[in-house]
């Protein structure tokens, strides 16, 4: 079974997924890392944050290649983004050709208070993120819900929204494990 677990940057997805992987024994595959590896091999980017600034066509090509690799895996938690906010608008993180390749059983969206997400982003020196306000983060979380609903209609997978309350990643992880096991 393949599960797709998503959330906006700074929601605490990596922390929660580390716990989920440990508790479930299911490997986590980072979709963005696969895309980055392909883009870097092609000389298109030097760091992962540059991917979202590539042309739409290039991003689509990278999505296809990463989706095909994941589709070959028997059991995995796919760590990705439901939608990608670009200078041109929101790009589906899982367009039709990727949905077919991945064939997920469930989409889980991890959410948190937008003000907390902003604070986490502001305090993370390891990433070169665009400066977004609380309203923009809220909008992105809402867009993720819309994309998840559309993906579910197409794929038949269920959608689960999990709150990652401040200081309680274990609680969010436990809820996710119950859904994906």
From Swiss-Prot:
Signal peptide: none annotated. It is found in: Cytoplasm. InterPro entries: Adenylate_kinase_AdkA, P-loop_NTPase. The keyword Kinase applies. It is an enzyme of class 2 (transferase). This is Adenylate kinase. Belongs to the archaeal adenylate kinase family. The gene is adkA. NCBIfam families: PRK04040.1. The lineage of its organism: Archaea, Methanobacteriati, Thermoplasmatota, Thermoplasmata, Thermoplasmatales. It comes from Thermoplasma volcanium (strain ATCC 51530 / DSM 4299 / JCM 9571 / NBRC 15438 / GSS1). ATP binds at residues 7-15.
């Amino acid at each position: 079974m393949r599960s797709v677990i998503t959330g906006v940057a700074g929601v605490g997805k990596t922390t929660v997924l580390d716990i989920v992987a440990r508790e479930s024994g299911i490997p986590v595959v980072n979709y963005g890392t696969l895309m980055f590896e392909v883009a870097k091999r092609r000389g298109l980017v030097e760091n992962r944050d540059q991917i979202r600034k590539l042309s739409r066509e290039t991003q689509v090509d990278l999505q296809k290649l990463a989706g095909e690799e994941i589709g070959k895996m028997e059991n995995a938690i796919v760590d990705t983004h439901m939608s990608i906010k670009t200078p041109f608008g929101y790009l589906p993180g899982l367009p039709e050709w990727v949905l077919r390749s991945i064939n997920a059983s469930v989409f889980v969206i991890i959410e948190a208070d937008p003000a907390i997400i902003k604070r986490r982003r502001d305090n993370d020196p390891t990433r070169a993120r665009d400066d977004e306000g609380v309203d923009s983060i809220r909008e992105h979380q809402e867009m993720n819900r819309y994309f998840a609903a559309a993906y579910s209609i197409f794929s038949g997978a269920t959608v689960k929204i999990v709150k990652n309350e401040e200081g309680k990643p274990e609680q969010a992880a436990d809820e996710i494990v119950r859904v994906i096991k």
